[in-house]
């Protein structure tokens, strides 16, 4: 992140606030252990997959509607609300550690995820548009993803000693405290894009007419609240329609949406890394360290995203294809039930995970460049929506496949999807702006 100081002062300040927001979002020790937490409270693999699917379904249903909302109202307010709901999720897990409590928590978390998805990216990109600094977007997104992965790694490393000191209760309540801190960082984000939006222009055009001699005597007065509500609904529906048209009707945008959704949604296999480690013979504490190896890979991948933004599509495709091969080999190595193969397997998975992160960040930046309409958050939310479908497919495959295959063999299947994604990149990745 040393190059952050080379950015213009205004962009640097924006980058710092964005990094603080995203960094605190995942500084959660519970991340390393919640799969094991569910298992230790009597839930099987299928039930855990059901919980994860419930999380994704909630975010799926609300994804695009919340994106249009973010194109209509204050994006910062929505991000603050998202942070509060995330904290509520972990409180529910601590006070009601049962299938129902975990399920309710995931529903709340799903709402929080839908409010953030697309909203944060649109807020940052539109702010950069107003500054004439859109080329900084990929770097800032790489730094924010790097901050996320750094804090995830820190949280994972802290999870083991926290668990040893106070069990799941200490891990959970520390996570609640971090979620509250995350809420505070949301207040520091820009309150709105600097550039006037299409919505604001509509507001100017739609100012109510002043009373005049042509007013109808005795006509029922139009209440300001009713008028504002109607205008707000009209703006919302306009943004929803505009974003939907661009996401589905513009070829380069549609392909960018699909590619980003595939690359990001596929990473939901990381929810099973803890269980994969345990299935390979690792203890609970060691499993947290092994998950940390994969996070280290994603951290490096995120930090390299800014440099990789200029790499040709075929180069990115070749890198992702190599990642698919490494992922398959790594997952199968974990299943060998040997300490050496266990660690070697997770190193391979970590490298593959990092490459996937690099390519996914670049794909996200290219998508933002391709969007030309005012409903940026709505279009971005379509990618988030489809990524939830991919995530649901991942959870479904794991739930079904583990009935016949080992965990390691099941996880290895997703390396094949990485190979397919690599073949799609040359034709689906939007061109540089």
Predicted feature descriptions by range:
Residues 1-12, 191-258:
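Juxtamembrane intracellular "pre-TM" segments in multi-pass secondary transporters
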């Amino acid at each position: 992140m040393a190059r952050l100081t080379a950015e213009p002062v205004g962009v640097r300040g924006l980058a710092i606030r964005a990094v603080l927001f995203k960094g605190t979002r995942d500084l959660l020790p519970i991340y390393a252990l919640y799969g094991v937490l569910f298992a230790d409270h009597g839930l099987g693999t299928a039930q855990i997959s059901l919980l994860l699917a419930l999380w994704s379904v909630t975010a799926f249903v609300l994804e695009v509607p919340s994106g249009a909302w973010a194109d209509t109202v204050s994006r910062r307010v929505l991000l603050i609300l998202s942070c509060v709901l995330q904290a509520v999720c972990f409180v529910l897990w601590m006070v009601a550690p049962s299938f129902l409590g975990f399920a309710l928590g995931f529903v709340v978390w799903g709402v929080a995820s839908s409010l953030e998805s697309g909203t944060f990216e649109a807020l940052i990109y539109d702010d950069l548009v107003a500054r004439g600094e859109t080329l900084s977007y990929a770097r800032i997104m790489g730094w924010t993803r790097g901050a996320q992965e750094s804090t995830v790694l820190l949280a994972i490393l802290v999870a083991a000693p926290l668990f040893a000191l106070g069990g799941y209760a200490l891990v959970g309540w520390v996570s609640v405290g971090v979620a509250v801190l995350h809420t505070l960082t949301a207040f520091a984000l820009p309150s709105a894009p600097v550039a006037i939006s299409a919505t604001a222009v509509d507001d100017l055009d739609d100012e109510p007419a002043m009373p005049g001699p042509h007013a109808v005597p005795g006509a029922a007065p139009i209440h300001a609240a009713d008028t504002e509500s109607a205008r707000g609904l009209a703006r919302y529906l306009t943004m929803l329609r505009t974003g939907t048209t661009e996401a589905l009707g513009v070829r380069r945008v549609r392909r960018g949406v699909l590619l980003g959704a595939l690359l990001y949604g596929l990473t939901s296999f990381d929810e099973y890394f803890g269980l994969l480690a345990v299935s390979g013979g690792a203890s609970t504490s060691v499993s947290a360290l092994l998950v940390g190896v994969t996070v280290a890979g994603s951290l490096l991948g995120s930090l390299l995203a800014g440099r990789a933004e200029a790499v040709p599509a075929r180069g990115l495709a070749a890198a992702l294809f190599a990642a698919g091969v490494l992922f398959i080999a790594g997952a199968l190595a974990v299943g060998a039930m040997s300490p050496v193969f266990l660690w070697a397997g997770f190193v391979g998975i970590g490298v593959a995970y990092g490459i996937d992160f690099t390519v996914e960040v670049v794909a996200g930046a290219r998508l933002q460049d391709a969007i030309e309409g005012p409903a940026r958050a709505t279009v971005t939310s379509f990618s988030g929506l489809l990524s939830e479908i991919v995530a649901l497919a991942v959870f479904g495959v794991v739930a079904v496949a583990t009935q016949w295959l080992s965990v390691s063999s099941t996880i290895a299947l997703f390396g094949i999807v990485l190979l397919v994604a690599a073949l799609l990149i040359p034709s689906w990745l939007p061109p540089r702006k």
